[in-house]
């Protein structure tokens, strides 16, 4: 049941139906319970489970997470910081593309179930995949601004990674973290 709800409520179909039932910014349990529920049998639980894994891992890569161990770019065993940042950028982009594919697959499934394939947008732009480390989301240009180049996204990602590395290094110096052990000391 939980996978069913996660998949459905995170679909563009549910977003459209909620917009019809509750056109204001207020959303209450009543509007959710009024959504037309179809007995569709089995939805693909892999989608919601994998998306939860991806987003949880993304969150745990941040120092503000209770489960933060160490900066993710320090886990690859690279001898050069440039190589570590390159690998982290590549993995961040790959994770964002995987999440985009799963979200699109989920949207397509629910649009087909409700026969709304021509009414709702099923494709998810990479800039809407709200992973913290998705460069296209984190550094999306403001409305009306020109699109950024791949090199600009990479550079902004490196800058943020460098700031986070400095923060972690200060934490190590102050005794909050250890180079030898993951997480808080």
Feature roles, as predicted:
Residues 1-185:
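S-adenosyl-L-methionine
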């Amino acid at each position: 049941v939980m996978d069913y709800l996660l998949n459905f409520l995170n679909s563009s179909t549910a977003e459209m139906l909620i917009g019809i039932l509750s056109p204001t910014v207020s959303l209450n349990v009543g509007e959710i319970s009024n959504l037309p529920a179809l007995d569709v049998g089995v939805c693909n639980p892999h989608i919601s489970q994998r998306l939860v894994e991806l987003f949880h891992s993304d969150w745990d890569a941040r120092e503000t997470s209770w489960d933060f161990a160490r900066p993710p770019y320090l886990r690859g065993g690279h001898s050069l910081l440039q190589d570590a940042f390159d690998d982290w950028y590549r993995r961040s982009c790959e994770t964002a593309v995987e999440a985009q594919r799963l979200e699109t697959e989920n949207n397509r499934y629910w649009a087909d179930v409700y026969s709304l394939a021509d009414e709702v947008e099923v494709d998810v732009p990479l800039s809407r995949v709200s992973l913290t480390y998705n460069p296209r989301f984190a550094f999306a240009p403001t409305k009306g601004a020109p699109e950024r180049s791949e090199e600009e996204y990479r550079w902004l990602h490196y800058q943020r990674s460098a700031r986070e590395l400095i923060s972690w290094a200060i934490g190590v110096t102050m005794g909050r973290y250890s180079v030898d052990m993951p997480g808080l000391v």
